[in-house]
From Swiss-Prot:
InterPro entries tied to this protein: Cyt-f_TM, Cyt_f, Cyt_f_lg_dom, Cyt_f_lg_dom_sf, Rudment_hybrid_motif
Quaternary state and interactors: The 4 large subunits of the cytochrome b6-f complex are cytochrome b6, subunit IV (17 kDa polypeptide, PetD), cytochrome f and the Rieske protein, while the 4 small subunits are PetG, PetL, PetM and PetN. The complex functions as a dimer.
Cofactor descriptive note: Binds 1 heme group covalently.
Entry binding sites for heme: 35, 55, 58-59
Protein name, entry field: Cytochrome f
Regions annotated as coiled coil: none
Mode of membrane association: Single-pass membrane protein
GO biological process: photosynthesis
One Gene Ontology term, aspect cellular component: plasma membrane-derived thylakoid membrane
Function: Component of the cytochrome b6-f complex, which mediates electron transfer between photosystem II (PSII) and photosystem I (PSI), cyclic electron flow around PSI, and state transitions.
Length: 317
């Protein structure tokens, strides 16, 4: 019964996030998105065998991501994993229609097996305040230890708090006390490549041939066609979508790979690993007992020393 309830909750959560995703496209088509959604739809796991998080396949620029997790946590306890996605305030980028739009952010946290998103009834008031307006989704029904967030407005979500529930090895022998690794990724802004391999308009467009720019045509939607004539008189047409700014003009001589536009991208992706220790309560008790024992030993040594000094003083030594 409990498993059926969890499955229904997962499907409901995914349905809500999908509705939000679709409605955001319909009602806010100019917003610039950072899509963990794409990774979810195209990769069985968000982390490749090399350790690279797959978001980096589309978001080619690198920018820092910072994570804060506690050094150690107790069994069956709720703790915060904080992902920080810094960028300059009021920064805007090129949207899909070529207009300037605010940046969006997204994040993925790959928790160790047994760790998962804490149920809301165990969230503290502080966590509820810090996660207001944030929707968490499991990467898949089978992987409740992988949590994705986004797209979210970047100006108010440069820090994303993930409420995490640790496992209890005393009730589930599949898990153990000790050190665990977390894999974390954070992104701001749109990608440069779609999962299909096609370029977005948020990237530098380059020439695929060498020659002289014969002419530049402006299309009705604001995009360009750059016609390049090689030494044999053959014309190659390079399509440049709306958004990037041309940095070439007619009669310019160019080589293969030379940029035709500026680089409009201002966002980027970053990933890092973190560690957390699942602390055994018996180990904590033992450690406390050890420190108490050391403290008592020190006190006894001091008392013994004073006693010896008194005896020596009485004997005139």
């Amino acid at each position: 019964m409990k498993g059926l309830k969890n499955q229904i909750m997962k499907k409901t959560s995914l349905f809500i996030c999908t509705l939000l995703f679709i409605s955001s496209i319909v009602f806010y088509p100019k917003i610039s998105f950072a899509y963990p959604f794409w990774a979810q739809q195209n990769y069985e796991s968000p982390r490749e065998a090399t350790g690279k998080i797959v978001c980096a396949n589309c978001h080619l620029a690198q920018m820092p991501t910072i994570a804060e997790v506690p050094q150690s946590v107790g069994a069956d306890s709720v703790f915060k994993a904080v992902v920080k996605i810094p960028y300059k305030n009021d920064l805007k980028e090129i949207g899909a229609d070529g207009s300037e739009v605010p940046l969006q952010v997204g994040a993925v946290v790959m928790l160790p097996d047994g760790f998962k998103l804490a149920p809301q009834e165990r969230w503290t008031e502080e966590i509820k305040e810090e996660t207001e307006g944030v929707y968490f989704t499991n990467y898949s029904e089978e992987q409740d230890n992988i949590i994705i967030v986004g797209p979210l407005p970047g100006d108010t979500n440069k820090e994303i708090v993930f409420p995490v529930l640790s496992p209890d090895p005393s009730t589930n022998k599949e898990y153990h006390y000790g050190k665990y690794s977390l894999h974390i990724g954070g992104n701001r802004g749109r990608g440069q490549v779609y999962p299909t391999g096609d370029k977005s308009n948020n990237v530098v467009f380059t020439s695929s041939t060498a020659g002289t720019i014969n002419s530049i045509e402006t299309i009705e939607d604001g995009s360009y066609q750059v016609n390049i004539e090689n030494d044999n008189g053959e014309i190659t047409t390079e399509a440049v979508p709306v958004g990037p700014q041309l940095i070439v003009k007619a009669q310019d001589k160019i080589n293969v790979g030379d940029p035709l536009t500026n680089d409009p991208n201002v966002g980027g992706f970053g990933q890092l690993d973190a560690e957390v220790v699942l602390q055994s309560p018996y180990r904590v008790i033992g450690l406390i007992a050890f420190f108490i024992g050391v403290g008592l030993t020190q006190i006894l040594l001091v008392l013994k020393k004073k006693q010896v000094e008194k005896v020596q003083a009485a004997e005139g030594i």
